């Protein structure tokens, strides 16, 4: 039987929010079977739990924000991506502010935190959402067109293409494919950092955003080059970060997907729209378990590989 997974012990981190610049303490704790992934705002007078569901997403400007009532948590996608990549089903995330710390701008620090705590197999079957027919969402036309789709696939595969008119991005490749069954999330995706341009950063800061961003937690470019002294971590780091984001956005659905995800210029808003489109059509998916691990897709039967 493919079993649900949580952590063996508690893991903690301290950082700053990318947009707020505010100090944030994060505590990752084991959770019982069928809990799902739950953010707990412990800084509020009465702690508030926000459980990950597609409907919990209430804002997708610059990041994915989840909320319930008046409580929210922003920029959840990198931590959710790490949970997806390592196959964590049940987790409590205590947080002392309304934004997940950006740490190094990728998911690698979250992978380290999760793996440091250890992964515990639980006595309950892991439930998957298996896509049974193609679902697609589109926006815009011509040069502004963007789209994302999910199709049936015995496993989990993501293909992403970006379209940035910048000499550095053009030279590194704008399309990548990642298959959870044959590739390593920790090695191939997790270290890809968020990126931005100096003009954008200046504008966002004038609006009170990106206050915690800098060269230590993002790739920053001017009109011609990367400004980070160490350069890129991957040749195709830009589009790999889009895969990282997509994995986090899609894992908000609350269960691992069995599907092929394909996207062109998609972002947080379109990814969430895709999840809602899927859930709106009961004939497009089914919830499955694997009593016989040999019948499970490759890559799901083993605890996530280390670095």
Swiss-Prot record:
GO cellular component: membrane
Pathway assigned in UniProt: Glycolipid biosynthesis; lipid IV(A) biosynthesis; lipid IV(A) from (3R)-3-hydroxytetradecanoyl-[acyl-carrier-protein] and UDP-N-acetyl-alpha-D-glucosamine: step 2/6
InterPro entries the UniProt entry points to: Ribosomal_Su5_D2-typ_SF, UDP-acyl_GlcNac_deAcase, UDP-acyl_GlcNac_deAcase_C, UDP-acyl_N-AcGlcN_deAcase_N
Cysteine-cysteine disulfides: none
Residues engaged in binding Zn(2+): 78, 241, 245
Keyword annotations from UniProtKB, A to Z: Hydrolase, Lipid A biosynthesis, Lipid biosynthesis, Lipid metabolism, Metal-binding, Zinc
Essential cofactor(s): Zn(2+)
Reactions performed catalytically: a UDP-3-O-[(3R)-3-hydroxyacyl]-N-acetyl-alpha-D-glucosamine + H2O = a UDP-3-O-[(3R)-3-hydroxyacyl]-alpha-D-glucosamine + acetate
GO MF terms held by the record: metal ion binding; UDP-3-O-acyl-N-acetylglucosamine deacetylase activity
Broadest EC class assigned to this enzyme: hydrolase
Keyword Lipid metabolism included in the entry's annotation: yes
Residues annotated as the enzyme's active site: 268
Any one GO BP annotation for this protein: lipid A biosynthetic process
Enzyme Commission number(s) of this protein: 3.5.1.108
Signal peptide: none
Role according to the record: Catalyzes the hydrolysis of UDP-3-O-myristoyl-N-acetylglucosamine to form UDP-3-O-myristoylglucosamine and acetate, the committed step in lipid A biosynthesis.
NCBIfam families: lpxC
Family under the similarity heading: Belongs to the LpxC family.
Name this polypeptide is given: UDP-3-O-acyl-N-acetylglucosamine deacetylase
């Amino acid at each position: 039987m493919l079993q649900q997974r949580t952590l063996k012990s508690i893991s903690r981190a301290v950082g700053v929010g990318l947009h707020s610049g505010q100090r944030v303490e994060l505590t990752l704790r084991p959770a019982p079977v069928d809990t799902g992934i739950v953010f707990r705002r412990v800084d509020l007078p009465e702690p508030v739990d926000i459980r990950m569901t597609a409907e919990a997403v209430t804002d997708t400007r610059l990041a994915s924000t989840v909320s319930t009532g008046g409580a929210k948590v922003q920029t959840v996608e990198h931590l959710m991506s790490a949970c997806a990549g390592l196959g964590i089903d049940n987790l409590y995330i205590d947080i002392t502010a309304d934004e997940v710390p950006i740490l190094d701008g990728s998911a690698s620090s979250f992978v380290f935190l999760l793996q440091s705590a250890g992964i515990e197999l639980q006595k309950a079957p892991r439930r998957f959402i298996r896509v049974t027919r193609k679902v697609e969402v589109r926006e815009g036309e011509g040069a502004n067109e963007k789209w994302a789709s999910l199709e049936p696939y015995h496993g989990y595969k993501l293909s992403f293409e970006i379209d940035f008119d910048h000499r550095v991005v053009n030279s590194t490749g704008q399309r990548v494919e990642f298959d959870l069954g044959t590739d390593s999330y920790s090695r191939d995706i997790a270290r890809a950092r968020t990126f931005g341009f100096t003009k954008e950063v200046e504008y966002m800061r004038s609006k009170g955003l990106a206050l915690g961003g800098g060269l230590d937690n993002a790739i920053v470019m001017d009109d011609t080059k990367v400004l980070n002294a160490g350069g890129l971590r991957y040749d195709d780091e830009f589009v790999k970060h889009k895969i990282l984001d997509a994995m986090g956005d899609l894992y908000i659905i609350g269960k691992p997907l069995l599907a092929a995800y394909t996207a062109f210029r998609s972002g947080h808003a379109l990814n969430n729209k895709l999840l809602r489109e899927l859930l709106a059509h009961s004939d497009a998916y089914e919830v499955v378990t694997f009593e016989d691990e040999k019948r499970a897709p490759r890559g799901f039967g083993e605890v996530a590989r280390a670095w």
